Amino acid sequence: YANMDDINKLLNSSFDRLKVYIPTLPIPQIYAQIGALDQSIVVGNQTIGISLDKYLGKDYPLYKKYYYPSQIKTMTRDNIVPDCLNFYLLSLYPMHDFESRTQLERDLHIGKIMWVCNIALGYKFFKSRYVNMIDQYMNKNKSISIENLLKNNDYSYIIKM
């Protein structure tokens, strides 16, 4: 990770896109760190910390000792910016009453955050049934802003589709 120009460029363009849709979005300070293989992205106080040790590639030998193959495939350079956006947006738009929500509502909340990350990235990185449900909903309801989508924690309107 001696050169992170590609990551910086994608972070900048992604946050520029987000600012178009969410003008009040605070732009975080971003730093890189070496962790203890226990966290990939650390978010707090308008900062994002990228633990580079969690993005050393799917062939990094130490990962095989501690992680499942499904986890290892996400531990690549290509996942850094999507993960930064995902965890940062989750910190700003948490799900209220998480414990009392159904699994479907929880999945839709994550799908909503991932859908917005895809918009910010400018390409479809996150793909799931729930991201598709949000995409269908937003295509049918073009008057709903991305900011309002993120602020709304009522998923009954999507579940009924």
What residues fall within each predicted segment?
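Acidic/His-rich structured neighborhood in mature extracellular/periplasmic domains
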Residues: 2-144, 151, 157-160
